[in-house]
């Protein structure tokens, strides 16, 4: 995971699916009972189990990418002992609240996700009080009285904890990303068996765009030929994507297609022209994250006209 630019996770969105004879919404949990949740077995159950964790990280990541040009300099200044009159810190408290709620309401069947969540929360318990003190120090402009002595003392506590947080957070992000991709693959296998070719194409598009953003390295080690080959395949697939069976899904697909095309153009410009421009990598991630947001609105269940719908 590239430090400072943690991509949003393309969540598996079901919209409303028919499960076991009943209507089951994407945010609905089978049960709050831990034993029941841990022994879920269907793809839908597992999707709903990890969904709150993905939502928690999506929110944190969106802020982190949007304010990377302030968050990264703040950390570097605190690490190096250089001083500024303002600081920008990540939204640690919001992440902690969201992860605690996810852990309470939706235990997952994945030990790596559960353990990584516990690790992140353990670090946040130590990090948040120091971050609060640091924020208050700068808001109250105490540096005007002590010539940044208090800042240096708090930074000595904050920086090691922040580094520890990034390590544990990246582990959780990676675990969720891997599990999410597994669920995409499981869902795709089901759809292949049901001859849902449009939904399969949609899933493969999301997997390919995720692979592409991971291939692009801001340090100059990008395999540009591989990226370009992916972009060409993405373009072919997005042009083949059909609009779906309902007006709502058709609108969502059109917006998704437009967003994918924007991402392809941005990625191509980056590897050809803009890779030496520092802000270009952030802008590429913003385009990617926008595309993920559009993908999450598409109801895969309504992408193909099934035999049941045709009757």
Where do the model's predicted regions map?
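N-terminal Sec/ER secretory leader and immediately downstream segment
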Residues: 44-150
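N-terminal Sec-pathway targeting helices
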Residues: 2-15
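Immediate post-signal-peptide N-terminus of mature secreted/exported proteins
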Residues: 29-84, 152-159, 174, 186-207, ...
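Extended amphipathic alpha-helical interaction segments
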Residues: 151-257
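A cross-kingdom marker for long, charged
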Residues: 229-311
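Secondary-structure edge/capping motif, primarily at the C-terminal ends of alpha-helices
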Residues: 64-78, 102-109, 131-145, 179, ...
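Hydrophobic alpha-helical membrane-insertion segments, chiefly the h-region
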Residues: 12, 16-27
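Polar/charged, Q/E/K-enriched amphipathic alpha-helical segments with strong coiled-coil propensity
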Residues: 132-163, 271-285, 289
């Amino acid at each position: 995971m590239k430090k400072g630019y943690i991509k949003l996770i393309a969540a598996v969105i079901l919209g409303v699916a028919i499960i076991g004879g009943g209507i089951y919404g994407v945010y609905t949990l089978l049960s709050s009972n831990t034993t029941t949740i841990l022994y879920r077995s269907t793809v839908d159950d597992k999707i709903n189990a990890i969904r709150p964790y993905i939502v928690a990280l999506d929110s944190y990541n969106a802020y982190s990418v949007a304010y990377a040009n302030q968050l990264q300099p703040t950390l570097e200044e605190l690490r190096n002992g250089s001083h500024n009159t303002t600081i920008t810190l990540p939204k640690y408290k919001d992440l902690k609240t969201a992860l605690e709620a996810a852990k309470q309401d939706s235990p997952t069947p994945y030990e790596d996700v559960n353990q990584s969540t516990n690790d992140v929360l353990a670090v946040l318990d130590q990090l948040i009080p120091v971050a609060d003190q640091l924020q208050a120090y700068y808001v109250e402009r105490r540096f005007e009285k002590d010539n940044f002595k208090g800042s240096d003392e708090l930074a000595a506590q904050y920086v090691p904890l922040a580094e520890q947080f990034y390590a544990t957070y990246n582990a959780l992000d990676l675990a969720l990303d891997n599990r999410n991709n597994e669920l995409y693959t499981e869902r795709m296998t089901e759809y292949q068996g049901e001859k849902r070719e449009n939904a399969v194409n949609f899933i493969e598009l999301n997997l390919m765009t995720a692979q592409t953003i991971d291939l692009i390295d801001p340090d100059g080690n990008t395999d540009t030929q591989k990226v370009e080959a992916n972009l060409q395949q993405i373009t072919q697939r997005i042009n083949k994507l059909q609009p779906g069976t309902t007006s709502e899904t058709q609108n969502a697909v059109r917006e998704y297609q437009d967003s994918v095309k924007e991402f392809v153009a941005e990625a191509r410009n980056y590897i050809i022209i803009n890779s030496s421009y520092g802000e270009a990598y952030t802008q590429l991630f913003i385009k990617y994250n926008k595309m993920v947001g559009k993908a999450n609105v598409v109801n895969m269940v309504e992408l193909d006209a099934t035999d049941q719908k045709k009757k």
